[in-house]
Amino acid sequence: MALWRCSSSWLSSVSRSSGGVGGGESKVSPEIAPVSGGEGEGEEEEGEEERWSRLLPELLTEIMRRVDAGAERWPPRRDVVACACVCRRWRDAAVSVVRPPLECGRITFPSSLKQPGPRDAPMHCFIRRNKKNSTFYLYLSLTQALTDKGKFLLAARRFRNGAHTEYIISYDCDDLFPGSNSYVGKLRSDFLGTKFIIYDSQPPYDGAKPSRSQSSRRFASKQINPNVSGGNYEVGQVSYKFNFLKSRGPRRMQCNIQCPVGQSTASDPLKKLISTSSPLALRNKAPRWHEHLQCWCLNFHGRVTVASVKNFQLVAPAGTSDPWGIADEETVILQFGKIEDDAFTMDYRQPLSAFQAFAICLTSFGTKLACE
């Protein structure tokens, strides 16, 4: 199914031979009649799939359990994705065995990027920025280091659309244009860069209505899952407070994010859509003034190393932790900070998903005329 397609960004394809039949420009090779993809080829593929699907359900489940247990981290975890791509029965077995990030703290399938993050500890990620072409790349950290090779998760590219700025978010780092088949969602800002709206390409819960505005039409015509209607669904808003007096100080931001309530434990969030959604209010944690350093400070627990106006931590105000089980108003739901010129850490936890956290962090880039 399309939801489990393996692009170059998620599962490395098998290397192909680069040598031609002739072996050189001066050699003449015989013509080879093209192989027609007739009924025989289709029957052969169906027979191959049927052979794999004949395994006993108990045996298939045990195979998936062992593969899942033996591949806790990427890149070995690509074996789990490969097994899910064999056929429908193998996919169903993978869905029944692989737990969502909320429970296992791991990202396995592309669908995991729109599921709530871990419950007990934050998911460590980092963002790399390319200023030349206005692109941003989200990676999953594979080690304790602040940056490493990482596992690619999402990419975004900034476009000017009249007086507005839009960030197109995609599963594919090489396909970041309007109309992309890998379109995940987008972020849209106002002229001043102080108010942002987050749009999801898929309905966040059952009965969600797509935006009707002309500017928020879905760019991609190809849906990730043909069983679910596609469109641009508003799932959050981020706003930065105006600084009329131009006083020096940290930015102040507020977020209202639509988070599903009663998330299904299935690895495929589109298999059973959530029937309800509730807005989660987040605000940035106020930093303290350090007299000796003469700067504003936050405790990032070693995950941020460079002072920047972009650095922030988001917490839930008192009384808004239910029904997501947030411990208290000191629990950091999302933190973002600079570690190099074009590298930033991004750590998130439930109820935010990787997609939502990435979109919120993207709002920190760019000039904010009324906030600086």
From Swiss-Prot:
Compositional bias segments (type: Low complexity): 7-18
Residues forming coiled coils: none
Entry-linked Pfam families: Tub
Residue ranges of the region described as Disordered: 1-51
Annotated tissue distribution: Ubiquitous.
Domain F-box stretches: 50-105
Acidic residues bias locations: 40-49
Similarity section: Belongs to the TUB family.
Protein name (Swiss-Prot/TrEMBL): Tubby-like F-box protein 9
Organism, scientific name: Oryza sativa subsp. japonica (Rice)
